[in-house]
Amino acid sequence: NRTSPGVPLKTTSYVEDKEYTMNSVDEVYTQVLKDLDLADTCLVNTTIKNHPYRADITAVYLLKSRIYLYMQNWEKALEYAQKVMTKNKSLLDLNTLTTETGDVLTKSSPETIFSMGGHLLASSLIMKYGENRWGDWEALPSYTISDDLVAAFDEGENDLRTQYYIFKTTLGDDYYAPYADGWLFRKVRGWEYGYKEVSDNFLFRTAEAYLNAAEAAAYTGDEGTARNLLKELRDYRMID
């Protein structure tokens, strides 16, 4: 319902001593698209950047695609996802990785469009109670991956995401918790290698454009385009 309460909108940078009220969902979407249209105008003629820490027009297109998908405006979502892929449709081939290679998500990945930096999501998902170290807490994470999500990876060892996105390990210890097997996050293995250049938190990747376009195409009745996009993405995620 576009008239339902959304979030309060604050469009000024200065502090105001006032209570804010929630704007409607429609007002929030209108403001987000207004900001993205301005970003589009400002960035459309800029040169291609050589690092991921500043947004360019490709990042604008991807975020527009995401917003239009949320709004169920399938035609616009597909249009902007295709604009992303016109600029960059490269994908990381998981078939080229090994478990010793390191992180799936890196600054130099062909998929990387924009990153806000190396926030370690692993410190809240892996370490005990969000501790800022690995050490003694390696088997006592705050969160594990749900059984429902693990079950969604239903192609077994052929699905390389089960090797590089998540991993199974024994959790618990003799004092804090009983031992049990569980699945943990591993796209960015900050606990193993220290500071990371990117995180999947606020990371824009070309893979999202494929998924946005496929979903939007399916909803517009273009099943052929949706299947082709998913197949192309799967080719980079499944064993050859």
Locations of the language-model features?
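Hydrophobic-face positions in mid-chain alpha helices that act as interaction patches
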Residues: 6-10, 14, 29, 54, ...
